[in-house]
Amino acid sequence: MERLNMTKKIMLDPGHGGHDPGAAENGLREKDLVLKIAKKTKTILEKVYGASVKLTRSTDVYIDLSQRAKLANNWGADYFVSIHINAAGGTGFESFRYDKLAASSSTGKQQKTVHDFIYNKIKAKTSDRGKKSKNLAVLRETKMPALLTENLFIDRKEDAVLLKQESFLDLLAEGHAEGIAAAVGLKKVSSSSKTSPTPKGVKMAVVKPNADGWLWVYDKPNWSAKHKKVKPGEAFTIDKTVTVNGSKMYKLKSGLYITAATKYVQIKQK
């Protein structure tokens, strides 16, 4: 019950969509990239931090700016992040808060937290354009603390090379997820439960019932390397336990990986 009380509602907003591709250059479209980053971020926030996460859009559809804010307001989100890719000359990463809010405000402090987490993931590959403020609709019309990120420049060849790499999108997603979790006070779900000593014999990880009705298994020990969905009740033979970004995963006999969080799986002896 205590964990439920601590759960935060996070609304992720992949910019553009449908007839609005956003910026497009170098064989890339902003609307596709930001949706991919948002989905990866959602997975990490849910599986690693136990957050309740929604996307303003999960497919290639157009939603106007006021409706995006309304979705977050009506849900009662605790935090809102709109994800974008920049254009029109330049390079690097930057973030925005509503311009009526000072850097010293609570929203400004949360901006600093999320911004720094993201930039620290990618600083070896790009530059920091700073923590900025602007009168943007999704920042102005949302009732909760809100942030907009601009993740490199789609029309700069060097930035586009990075944005074409799945591993770089993983870094952006990790930065967003870890930064958001830190900003709203979410802890890793594994940190609240001690790992029991591994019993001898063959162990099975059995998927527990959950609100989604499914759980991801992964190709490798990486929360973004999703392979397929499995259903509650499905059981998998455990090979060993590994630690990924501070949280536990089970490596399965099949070579795939699954979360070790007791919220999602239970262990049974074969």
Identify what each model region corresponds to.
Residues 2-9, 32, 36-193:
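Active-site-proximal helix/loop segments of hydrolytic enzymes
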Residues 7-25, 81:
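Catalytic-core environment of secreted peptidases
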Residues 10, 93, 146-147, 205, ...:
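A broad, low-specificity signal marking well-ordered, structured residues that form hydrophobic/aromatic
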Residues 14, 97, 151, 219, ...:
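Pocket-edge structural micro-motifs
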Residues 18, 153-155, 256-257:
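Acidic glycine-/aspartate-rich tracts in secreted/extracellular proteins
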Residues 22, 91, 105, 159, ...:
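Short acidic, gly/pro-rich beta-turn/loop elements at beta-sheet edges
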Residues 22-36:
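Glycine- and acidic-residue-enriched helix-capping/strand-helix junction motifs
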Residues 194-251, 257-270:
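Beta-loop motif signature
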